[in-house]
């Protein structure tokens, strides 16, 4: 981040999609994160099938716009033109809960289908990376345990589902 971070040295990166958090500066118990899925939708905007991408954000409107710009969401931004849709699955959870839930959904729905190094498109629109390494030995133990606590809780819930419908 260097000097691009601005005058406030305590501020988190203003664009967490483009800026990374390699040192884990966002505390796992920080609130205000949302887990969402990207779905194909019918003409009425209802989801068809399982999500093809799972993500987390602290601003769903901004993130939806970024997905339209990248090609992961189709349409020009008008609701009536969309063939895909961002649907919140969990709102206002902690960062650690969001990471755990996100990884559980990625695993459950098999959305890690994106090809690293290839442009995002409607053909290459799945997750390219896992939310976090469930076997990490380098992450602070309490942080890893917090992520895993919510990964395990959501995995258990998803394993009990019938018909693969997301549960909020």
Regions found by a protein language model. Name each.
Residues 26-168:
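Catalytic toxin/effector domains delivered as secreted proteins or via bacterial secretion systems
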Residues 1-28:
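Short turn/helix-capping motifs enriched in Asx and small/polar residues
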